[in-house]
Amino acid sequence: MSNEDETTRLMSSDEMDYLLETAGINALEEIISQNDSTGINLDTNETAQDSSYDSIRRSPSILSVAKSVEGEHGRRKLLCLYGLVMIICIAESISMTATIPLVMDKVAEGISDENGHYDSVAVQTIVSSISSSTMMIAGAISIFMAGKWGELSDRIGRVRVFKYMSGIRVIGLLTHVFTLSSKMKYHKWAIVLTACIVPSFGGLFALVANGNSYVSDIVKTEHRMVTIGIMMSCIYATMGVGPMFGSFLVKWTHGNGFIPIYTSIAFVILALIICETIMVEPRHETQMAHSQSTYTKRREKLRSQSGSDDARNYQSVTYGKFQIMRLMDLLAPVKKLWLKPDSAGSLVPRHTVILLIVLDILFVCGTTSCMPALILFSTYEYKWHAVELGYFISILGIGRGVVLLVVSPTLLYTLKRIYQHLNHSIDKIDIFCIQFSMIVITLSLFVMIRFGEKTPTSMIIFALLQALSAFCSPTLQSGIIKYTSKKHTGEMFGAMALVRSCVMLVIPPILLKLYGSTVSVNPSLFMYIPFSTSIVAILLTFFLRIYKNPPLDGP
């Protein structure tokens, strides 16, 4: 596999905000360039070590992406990819909110007495435990499976991997709906294990990674960032509309929560049909054969290094070495975040990157990590069901998409006219965006702590304020990759994705556990943790320093 293919494969779903904002920036600059005769001047003396964020300013717009794909056949492949991704994402988002009330009903059925009475606090505690167990198991498996899917798609093709992912989704949804139906008695671990199937082996992380690989096969290098940004906008659109559509289905069927899941299964089956009939494999047979040959040689090399004559011991040692090497290979990109001193011996770049990583962790703690516990809080405090949850998630998802595609590019364009944009270091534009985002995150959590137990309107205000922080993630990521050369961009993204995955593996289960333990005393107590981390994040932003030396050569 070439270095270029490897870099593309390392792109993960954690780049979603960064890539989507890229698409918005280019769309805005295309409009400006058409209406303003002065346009945006390009610096022809920029070197190959320019940051990725600067490449956004010079890259083609969305309106010219179609020209980057050679021939009508290539453009049709892209349209098929966008359609397939949207169908799979809407299938996932439709059942997202309907599943939670079904799990709660199943738990209530399992712990109720002979008269049908049950303790609602006990239900919240058990559902919290189910959610945290599911997230931990699925998160641990998906970290390893994401890389495996990328390797597998190189060997057998992108379309076949899409087929496998769709098939796994059908199996996962069918088994999960069976465990929640009246045909099966309540069993906690049956619900947990069936809920782990889809996110562990065919979740959004793997879907986006395979989509990135598909794009890399048919789109020129200089146009890939914008093309992937368009794919991300398709994902955000469907992930925002899906929960609302699911709410309409539940309302239309008078509260039948199984209908959205059946609809999801139908959409996934449609995706399977599209893969079988319309989708065209972009990867050439010789490339797949080369990847298979490389994989076989690597396995043979591991066997030859085992040095064991005993057959059984030989197999176990080989397998153990192979898994250890895979684990080390998975963690290898993290070393890129520990930058070397520059030519003058300064450690400012290293300290800044570490601080940005810490801010990214705190950002995740204040946004994504608290959502599972917050959703359970809403079902307990406001008695929300699938319909209301669908509206809430749709507001949050659509709001983030609007901010990334409209508000963020406009804000950045305005700030670039006020402050100097730096290619080799974070600048005042980045610091302003990070500080603003952390402030609105803190305000959103304060609203929930202060008014969350009084009115459900606080959830809507929370969603709108959280949406305003959407450009924090791309700002942090673009700031980090300013300190490295383009040839290491994929590895840096991979390292950041791995750090985020580890955070999501730990923090949400902790918040769910805390919520389950305190729901009978103070349901909103868990919110103080993300609220505290957000305050710490605001304070840390004042320690960010602009690196004034010439651009780095990269780590």
UniProtKB/Swiss-Prot annotation:
Keywords from the named record = Membrane, Transmembrane, Transmembrane helix
Tell me a GO cellular component: membrane
UniProt key word Chaperone = no
Q: Which InterPro entries does this chain map to?
A: MFS, MFS_trans_sf
Asked whether the keyword Transmembrane helix is assigned, the reply is: yes
Instruction: Please identify the protein, giving its name as recorded.
Output: Uncharacterized membrane protein YJL163C
Example of a GO biological process term: transmembrane transport
At the top level of its lineage, which domain of life is listed? Eukaryota
- The coiled-coil segments of this chain are none
Residue ranges, Extracellular compartment? 1-83, 147-188, 251-257, 378-386, 450-459, 513-523
Where does the sequence pass through the membrane? 84-104, 126-146, 189-209, 230-250, 258-278, 357-377, 387-407, 429-449, 460-480, 492-512, 524-544
Q: How does it sit in the membrane?
A: Multi-pass membrane protein
Which parts of the chain does the record assign to the membrane side Cytoplasmic? 105-125, 210-229, 279-356, 408-428, 481-491, 545-555
Localization, per the record, is: Membrane
State the Gene Ontology terms under molecular function: transmembrane transporter activity
Pfam families per UniProt: MFS_1
Region (Disordered) location: 289-311
